[in-house]
Amino acid sequence: KRQVQAPPIIPRMVEAPVVNAPPPPPLLRPTLRFALSHPAHFIALGAGSGLARKAPGTVGTLWAWGMFAILQPHLNDAGWAMLIGLGTLVGWWACTVTARHMGIADSGHIVWDEVVAFWLVLWLVTPASFWSQLWAFALFRLFDAVKVGPMAWADRTFKGFGPRGGFGILLDDFA
């Protein structure tokens, strides 16, 4: 009779998690690949408008203005209210996820806050001529850059990663 030996018991080598691993370096300038890698990234980066090398917030606001011009003839007040409300809720999630994945609490490349807030501004001033909308654009960008009063408070108070930070990204533009 031939005896079959059981294979020797080999302990499985499992790599222990590194507790104090440094976080990955922050993603200072997102790429198109990053924007397309997750739906939240695409939304938070304003369908790619936030990928601009210079003044991504301004480019995102211009994209919002263009989308407003396209959508405005097709939406009534209830439609705009729903779009802005849903855009805010989805944006909260998208900005939270994207900020965490980028490793930057409020990257200038995250422009969904400009998009939804500028839609609100344009909706509130409608009907408005092109020149009135241009003034609204200029004032919106000025107040976004300067951040005085309630905008400064929101910007200081709601920082960090997680839902609170995602909410803060949106709130300073609504203020």
Where do the model's predicted regions map?
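Membrane interface segments of multi-pass transport proteins and intramembrane proteases
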Residues: 70-85, 153-165
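Short Lys/Arg-rich amphipathic alpha-helical segments
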Residues: 52-53, 58-72, 79-80, 87, ...
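Hydrophobic core segments of alpha-helical transmembrane domains in multi-pass membrane proteins
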Residues: 81-88, 132-143
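Extended, non-catalytic scaffold segments that flank or surround catalytic motifs
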Residues: 47-48, 68, 137-138
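Helix-coil boundary and interhelical linker segments in multi-pass alpha-helical membrane proteins
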Residues: 68-82, 121-134
